[in-house]
Amino acid sequence: MTKLNRSLRTALAAAVVAIWPLAGQAWEPTRNIEFIIPAGTGGGADQMARAIQAIVAKHNLAKVAILPINKSGGAGAEGFLDVKGSPGEPHKIIITLSNLFTTPLATNTPFNWRDLTPVQMLALDNFVLWVQADAPYKTAKDYVAAAKAAGPGKFRMAGTGAKQEDQIITVAIEQATGAQFTYIPFKGGGAVAVQLVGGHVNSTVNNPIEAVAHWRGGKLKPLCVFELKRMPYTAKVTDKMSWADIPTCKESGLDIDYLMLRGIFMPAGVSQEHVDYYIGLFAKIFETPEWKDLMERGAFNQTRLKGKEYAAWVAKEEARHVSLMKAAGFIAK
């Protein structure tokens, strides 16, 4: 073998060794990740997305930054259409709430969850019936009785968006009890809670994380939670009560339950390798103390799903929302 051939073989071997690790590496983002929030600032989706951003940055869980972007227009349609219009783009994710189902049903906006790629269920979010702390009602039954006695439309219920989850629950209360509320929509749960604190409305069905600061501050009080069982968190939020002390609405004579998805989707057309990266990222996030604190602070139902199980759950939940929306008269014609 000539000296030239030996040199050539050595160079080729070195090139193979240099390239081989790259060929075996899993995909990672090469630029910042857009994190679309199809809701306003201050609400539950916004708070969770920004908590995820902070956790990833604090623990150096990604080599790029996560950039939360609120796109709440059209009851979240703006955000969903943005992701739908980015097929194959792995640097874009979206956090979902029930407007994943309600917005296309109520507005005929041309998108469906099947236009996206399911990645990870983060948790399920509770809804709580809230009133002002100094309101005379001790139970949900007391409150509903007062609303009925006041007459149709006299009591005002604030909620996020029109024909979305908060109004679905409001209509369910009306149908179950005969009470009639004036429903007033706002862009996000943070604004909804502020309206109740200010006395501009009589009640809300805010998610726990949207109202907990006002509860702890002595401005609001919870009457019941719209879940089949009590929340498991026993640490005191106020000097007298924990999340676990809040009765279910069914216990209080209001036989209604509703949980909301907090989940992650990507655009259609991404690869399994792209999906796996985010599943791995969220697995790391779930182990951080900040995430565990968020789960307790927001009294989340810590159900997590991914892959086929997640997609099957979403399909079943879509069918349930079709039924709920029909019952409420919210399906667009």
Located regions from the model:
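Bacterial N-terminal signal peptides that target proteins for export
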Residues: T2-L12
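Cleavable N-terminal signal peptides
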Residues: A13-A14, G24
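N-terminal signal peptide c-region/cleavage motif recognized by signal peptidases
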Residues: I19-A23
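N-terminal (or domain-start) structured segment
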Residues: A26-D115, K154, Q175-N207, H214, ...
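Hinge/capping helix and adjacent helix->loop/strand transition within the periplasmic-binding protein
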Residues: P29, K58-H59, K63, D82-K92, ...
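An extracytoplasmic/periplasmic, membrane-proximal ligand-sensing/linker region
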Residues: T30-N32, A179, Q272-K333
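Short, surface-exposed alpha-helical segments at coil->helix boundaries
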Residues: D46-R50, A54, Q167, V171, ...
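C-terminal lobe and pocket-closing loops
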Residues: L124, K138, V212-E287, K316-A319
